[in-house]
Amino acid sequence: MTGRGTSSRFLTSVLHNGLGRYVQQLQRLSLSLSRDAPSSRGAREFVEREVTDFARRNPGVVVYVNPRPCAMPRIVAEYLNGAVREENVNSKSVEEIKSLVQKLADQSGLDVIRIRKPFHTDNPSIQGQWTPSPTNGLPSTGCGPENSGILLQLRCKHSKEPGALDRERDRIGSSFGFQAQAE
């Protein structure tokens, strides 16, 4: 499939999440299951063993358990952005349901789609994206201090021991990638 055929978007933060405090996007979790259907056995065991632990770990999520006669057990997840995800848990084990519920709690409610770029801004800079490299990966132009003959003068005012100037000159010169010259 080509890149133009799949939906995509720029990477954005959901509801500015992370500016201030973290807001979990899962708002409500509803478990519908039958009390006596054999396909609901894993869902019943999940409610008996794991649902209280999940509620303690996620205090911002409201958990509803609806025991009613139904053909297939299901989990309905409602998110803050209005998205609703419905998952069938027919004949699944407790561990599978536990991992599914945790996955629903960790998601944002948005569809999983291709991300165009790992960075995006609404106010782009005319200078381009910032990079810590001064040459931006380009070869050296020969205009740096190692090629222009600039004399590096260092003075160690705080140290009176012999050789301090030479050690400081060597330390600074090697960190900038050129050899310091003596005075």
From Swiss-Prot:
Location, primary (coarse class): mitochondrion
One GO term describing the cellular component: mitochondrion
GO term, biological process aspect, one: translation
UniProt keyword Cytoplasm present: no
GO molecular-function term, one example from the UniProt record: structural constituent of ribosome
Keyword Ribonucleoprotein assigned: yes
Biased composition range(s): Polar residues: 122-139
InterPro entries xref list: Ribosomal_mL43, Ribosomal_mL43/mS25/NADH_DH, Thioredoxin-like_sf
Annotated Basic and acidic residues bias: 162-172
Region of interest (Disordered), ranges: 120-144, 162-183
Annotated Pfam families: L51_S25_CI-B8
Record keywords, A-Z: Mitochondrion, Ribonucleoprotein, Ribosomal protein, Transit peptide
Expression by tissue: Ubiquitous with the highest levels in the liver, heart and kidneys. The skeletal muscle, brain and testis showed lower but detectable expression. Expression is coregulated with TWNK.
Membrane spanning residue stretches: none
Protein's cellular compartments: Mitochondrion
Family: Belongs to the mitochondrion-specific ribosomal protein mL43 family.
Binding partners and assembly: Component of the mitochondrial ribosome large subunit (39S) which comprises a 16S rRNA and about 50 distinct proteins.
Protein name: Large ribosomal subunit protein mL43
Organism, scientific name: Mus musculus
Recorded name of the encoding gene: Mrpl43
